[in-house]
Swiss-Prot record:
This is Protein Vpr. GO terms for cellular component: host cell; host cell nucleus; host extracellular space; virion component. Residues 1-42 are annotated as: Homooligomerization. The keyword Phosphoprotein applies. The gene is vpr. Keywords: Activator, AIDS, Apoptosis, Cell cycle, Host G2/M cell cycle arrest by virus, Host nucleus, Host-virus interaction, Ion channel, Ion transport, Modulation of host cell cycle by virus, Phosphoprotein, Transcription, Transcription regulation, Transport, Viral penetration into host nucleus, Virion, Virus entry into host cell. One of its GO terms (biological process) is symbiont-mediated activation of host apoptosis.
Length: 96
């Protein structure tokens, strides 16, 4: 029977350490784009729902990623990423 080869590669960074670093990066980015009271309320919601658990950390990471993605996608004023509305003439004509 075939077996997967043993992992002899370089040691990876521990998952929890990587997760906390990712959360810190997301929080720093979120503070630049969203009002602090919103983020504070989100943190309170996550804490009341999950308590002080890794499941809560994963949930807030997922939510912050989704919020930032949508924020950039619909057009953040701080970024070049996103949809930029095109100005058009009457009846969609783009040339004069």
């Amino acid at each position: 029977m075939e077996q997967a080869p043993e992992d002899h590669g370089p040691q990876r960074e521990p998952y929890h350490e990587w997760t906390l670093e990712l959360l810190e990066e997301l929080k720093n980015e979120a503070v630049r784009h969203f009002p602090r009271p919103w983020l504070h309320s989100l943190g309170q919601y996550i804490y009341s729902t999950y308590g002080d658990t890794w499941e809560g950390v994963e949930a807030i990471i997922r939510i912050l990623q989704q919020l930032l993605f949508i924020h950039f996608r619909i057009g953040c004023h701080h970024s070049r990423i996103g949809i930029i509305p095109q100005r058009r003439g009457r009846n969609g004509a783009s040339r004069s």
